[in-house]
Amino acid sequence: KNGSADECGELCFALPSDYKFNPDSKSNFEVFLMIEVIKHLIATRDNIGFGYYLEKESGFSSRTAFNGAMLVGMGDYEKEQQTMILDGAELSFLELLPLRPMELNFRKAHSAVELLNLFKEKLVMITPFISTRDDVCNVVAKM
């Protein structure tokens, strides 16, 4: 978002194929996370794109340790394959990557690419989202 009506974004959040949504449950962490992120993105005046991150100090849920999120490209596709022109506007496809506290702190001090490289080095998949996944910064030495 840079004030231009010529840019739009599509936010994706890949869930496991066996994910069970219960509309009557308040424990649908993934749904509430997405709602919180969307509310933040609508309200912010910051430029939103690859690597954009946000923090929710109280966390997104008492059931999880995730207190941040970062927007990343979808898969290992080239940038040109993650955008398209639709009715004269550029549409960018971004994926939501929930972050644990140490990952968020790492992102604050480093680039999005450096954090994504940690995921690769530690062999931790970012899609589909698994709420019990390892914290990629858990064993990173302090810099």
Regions found by a protein language model. Give the residues of each.
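Acidic, proline/glycine-rich low-complexity IDRs
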Residues: 4-7, 11-143
